[in-house]
Amino acid sequence: SFIERRGLYEARGEGEKAVDAKQGGGGDAARNDEPFFAARRDELQGRVGPRRFRHSLGVSDTAGELAHVYGVDEGEARLAGLLHDWDKGLDDPGILARADELGLELSDELRSMPRVLHGITAARALGRDFPELSPALLQAIERHTLGAPDMSDLDMVLYIADALEPGREGKRVEKLRRQIGK
C-alpha cells in the first residue's frame, strides 16, 4: 500500500506489534470509569478549541453506537473516541516537538506531514500519562488517521466514527451511515 511503501508506519517502536483485540485489551478501570471519562473530557476541553471538542464528543458517541452494533466494547470505544484528537490542538512545530519529546523515530516522509502525527503522539502521550488505558485503545487512537493493514475491530470502529460523527455532512457520509449494521 501507499502507506507501507512510504514507511509511514515506522513510528512504531522496534518490537512493537499490533494489538489483536476485538473488545479491547484490558483497561477495564479506565473504560468503565465515568469519573475518569469526565476528567479526561474536561481536560480535553482545555486542550482543543470548541469545534474540535464538539467533534470529539460526537466521535465518542458515534464510536459507542458502532461498538454496540458490531460487538466491540462500548466503553472502550467511547473513551477512544473522546481521546482520539488529544494532540490535534498542537500546531505543526508543536506536534514535531511532541514527537521528539516522546522519542518517536519518524521517517522523513512522515515528518514532512505533521498534521497526520496527532494520533501517534496522542497515543504515546496518553499511554505514558494514563497507564490504565489499554493497549487496544491506544492502538486505535494511533491508527485513526492513517489506518493500518491489520486493524482490529476497535481500530475500525474509531476510524469510521471519526468519519461519520454527527458534525460531518454530505451525501457520501449519509450513504455510509445507511450502511451501518448491514
Task: Kindly label every feature range from the protein language model.
Residues S1-A39:
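Non-catalytic terminal extensions that flank enzyme cores
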Residues A39-R47, H55, G64-K182:
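Divalent metal-dependent catalytic cores for phosphoryl transfer on phosphate-bearing substrates
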